[in-house]
């Protein structure tokens, strides 16, 4: 049996969602299924998933993860929470939340770029700690996108087009960055592609660190212990990593084709 922390209120929506799915009756499944399918069809008709998660919901997810799974990475969260909770409906987590919990989600206003190997609690703390963002709704891959898509139809072309169109439509990208000495996103091909898409479509890009990282970064800059120009010079898409080597090759090809002179 799972032992739940006393620091996690039972009213936490991510705890509640997990509990309600585990106790779901056939009648509830029959009631929820057509509603979820309607939301999924709307995403498909739109061509791109644009649902965002509110800052308060991000804070609730951070609290859930901090209390029960503090060592999870973003990848762990995807496979051990999202995929398990949404398995019976094969839908996005936000569409499931909207139907099962009745929490209305709005169109995203900020596209969040991050590394999948990030500690989930720390990543969510960065987003939840954003100032002047109480009215923002965040596009976060693991929550917004249906994680059950067939890879034969949702291949590189689908993902690259989705990122490009989402970034263009949403209008603002926030890149969560740490550690500052060698930020993981700047070594990942897909993250660099998202930065490129933001620049290519002339959209706003903000870089966000948590308080601890920001203090260390500012201190290193002030004391001259950090070579900013050298840091930037190391950013190289050709040397970046990707889960699939062919993705990296395709990303390089797309970027070169869109840049004048290659």
Task: Give the location of each predicted region.
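The feature represents the membrane-entry module of six-transmembrane cation channels
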Residues: 1-262
């Amino acid at each position: 049996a799972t032992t739940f922390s006393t620091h996690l209120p039972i009213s936490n929506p991510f705890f509640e969602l997990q509990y309600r799915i585990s106790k779901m009756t056939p009648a509830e499944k029959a009631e929820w299924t057509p509603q979820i399918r309607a939301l999924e069809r709307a995403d498909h008709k739109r061509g791109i998933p644009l649902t965002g998660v509110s800052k308060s919901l991000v804070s609730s997810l951070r609290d859930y993860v901090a209390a029960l799974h503090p060592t999870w990475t973003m990848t762990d969260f995807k496979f051990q929470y999202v995929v398990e909770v949404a398995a019976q409906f094969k839908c996005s987590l936000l569409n499931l939340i909207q139907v099962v919990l009745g929490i209305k989600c709005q169109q995203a206003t900020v596209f969040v770029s991050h590394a999948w190997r990030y500690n989930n609690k720390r990543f969510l703390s960065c987003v939840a700690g954003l100032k002047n963002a109480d009215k923002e709704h965040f596009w976060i891959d693991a929550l917004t996108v249906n994680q059950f898509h067939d890879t034969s139809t949702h291949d590189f072309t689908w993902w690259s087009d989705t990122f490009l169109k989402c970034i263009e439509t949403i209008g603002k990208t926030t890149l969560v960055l740490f550690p500052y000495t060698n930020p993981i996103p700047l070594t990942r091909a897909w993250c660099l592609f998202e930065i490129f898409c933001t620049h290519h479509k002339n959209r706003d890009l903000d870089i966000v660190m948590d308080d601890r990282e920001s203090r260390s970064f500012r201190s290193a800059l002030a004391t001259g212990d950090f070579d900013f120009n050298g840091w930037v010079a190391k950013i190289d898409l050709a040397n970046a990593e990707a889960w699939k080597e062919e993705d990296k090759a395709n990303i390089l090809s797309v970027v070169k084709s869109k840049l004048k002179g290659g």
